[in-house]
């Protein structure tokens, strides 16, 4: 009976040992990961510093090359300016031409064989193409036109003068008078006797002529009896009321 019990105990111990080892391995793995992250950060920082230093070095090299090129051009200009008067002071020696020997043929006397493709033209008759190039089709510019010079623009633009602003005149609105039509006219009072005659009586309205009877009414309508010549002789009883 002790056999199976001992076996179970051994399995439990092995399980505990393995679990302890696994935890330790996980802890070591995390430590290594942290160290790896630190190393990567340092590497990134070093690479940035390297790129920055390379850029600065390239700028200094470009500046040195520009300065060396400018020095070389300045030295070449100085050498040219110094060498020109020396060359002008020393006259060039003249070479004496030897007379041609009678036995040696001159190059002008040698005649080239004519080519079979395109015959050469003689020097006496110029080609029409060359003559057209020699004489331009347009007339030359007149001397007066060439003598004219355009006015040079002034470097400073003329300043525009500001006109003084004139004071604006206020327009007063003219409206109808405030005094009532036909009412008493009131004036501001001044002095001790201001109340006397302060209000003036209104003017009496103008007299209108009396209404007149229309003059277009015929005279026959006003007569009580009609004349004998009228066409309406039988209408003697006709009465017309005229308002007075």
Swiss-Prot record:
<dbReference type="GO" id="GO:0006275">
    <property type="term" value="P:regulation of DNA replication"/>
</dbReference>
<dbReference type="GO" id="GO:0005730">
    <property type="term" value="C:nucleolus"/>
</dbReference>
<dbReference type="InterPro" id="IPR056515">
    <property type="entry name" value="INO80E_N"/>
</dbReference>
<comment type="function">
    <text>Putative regulatory component of the chromatin remodeling INO80 complex which is involved in transcriptional regulation, DNA replication and probably DNA repair.</text>
</comment>
<keyword id="KW-0832">Ubl conjugation</keyword>
<feature type="region of interest" description="Disordered">
    <location>
        <begin position="59"/>
        <end position="179"/>
    </location>
</feature>
<keyword id="KW-0539">Nucleus</keyword>
<feature type="compositionally biased region" description="Low complexity">
    <location>
        <begin position="99"/>
        <end position="135"/>
    </location>
</feature>
<dbReference type="GO" id="GO:0060382">
    <property type="term" value="P:regulation of DNA strand elongation"/>
</dbReference>
<protein>
    <recommendedName>
        <fullName>INO80 complex subunit E</fullName>
    </recommendedName>
</protein>
<dbReference type="GO" id="GO:0006338">
    <property type="term" value="P:chromatin remodeling"/>
</dbReference>
<dbReference type="GO" id="GO:0051726">
    <property type="term" value="P:regulation of cell cycle"/>
</dbReference>
<keyword id="KW-0804">Transcription</keyword>
<dbReference type="GO" id="GO:0006281">
    <property type="term" value="P:DNA repair"/>
</dbReference>
<dbReference type="GO" id="GO:0031011">
    <property type="term" value="C:Ino80 complex"/>
</dbReference>
<keyword id="KW-0227">DNA damage</keyword>
<feature type="cross-link" description="Glycyl lysine isopeptide (Lys-Gly) (interchain with G-Cter in SUMO2)">
    <location>
        <position position="171"/>
    </location>
</feature>
<keyword id="KW-0234">DNA repair</keyword>
<dbReference type="GO" id="GO:0006310">
    <property type="term" value="P:DNA recombination"/>
</dbReference>
<keyword id="KW-0233">DNA recombination</keyword>
<feature type="cross-link" description="Glycyl lysine isopeptide (Lys-Gly) (interchain with G-Cter in SUMO2)">
    <location>
        <position position="159"/>
    </location>
</feature>
<dbReference type="GO" id="GO:0045893">
    <property type="term" value="P:positive regulation of DNA-templated transcription"/>
</dbReference>
<feature type="coiled-coil region">
    <location>
        <begin position="10"/>
        <end position="54"/>
    </location>
</feature>
<keyword id="KW-1017">Isopeptide bond</keyword>
<keyword id="KW-0175">Coiled coil</keyword>
<dbReference type="GO" id="GO:0005654">
    <property type="term" value="C:nucleoplasm"/>
</dbReference>
<dbReference type="Pfam" id="PF24237">
    <property type="entry name" value="INO80E"/>
</dbReference>
<dbReference type="InterPro" id="IPR026678">
    <property type="entry name" value="INO80E"/>
</dbReference>
<dbReference type="GO" id="GO:0033044">
    <property type="term" value="P:regulation of chromosome organization"/>
</dbReference>
<comment type="subunit">
    <text>Component of the chromatin remodeling INO80 complex; specifically part of a complex module associated with the N-terminus of INO80.</text>
</comment>
<keyword id="KW-0805">Transcription regulation</keyword>
